[in-house]
């Protein structure tokens, strides 16, 4: 695939990797029409990405009909990105489960930097993370948010495809085009 070639042509450090998900609107109706019919927009596509924080390239992505839990994507993403030998994997509170933390620590052999949910009381890795959580490393997670911002600003946050299958492909295409866009920025430096 094209995305794999882009990643091969770039030097990826992979020391810090961040995970997150964001929605892309799927409605092609006008906002005014949505107000008139007194209905919210029907559905959206959830775009899950994992990025290399240093190069700001998307290493792995998946698109699914939303709303979905971020945890379903996380395990597959962690198994896919472990080839980069990350030292830290960053994610927001939505990814705070013992299963995800176990996968990060045991399979990827990395440290999880995920803030605890307010009611976290059990689990070996969850309790251990109270001592290993580093705010200065976690603060770099905002890079994944800025990538979503760039994708939605430059390549549009609304999918024009009417079918779910084409809408998922459109979202994946936006991710690949973002990587091409980012590669040109890296090469200009």
Please name every model-derived segment.
Residues 14-17, 59, 140, 147, ...:
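A generic secondary-structure signal marking the coil-to-beta-strand transition
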Residues 162-189:
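Charge-patterned, long linear interaction tracts outside catalytic cores
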Residues 88, 93-161:
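Helix-centered, glycine/charged polyanion-binding patches within enzymatic domains
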Residues 25-31, 123-125, 171-172:
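Short, solvent-exposed polar/charged micro-motifs at secondary-structure junctions
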Residues 73, 143, 147, 169-172, ...:
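Catalytic-loop motifs flanking and including active-site residues across diverse enzymes
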Residues 1-106:
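Polybasic low-complexity intrinsically disordered regions
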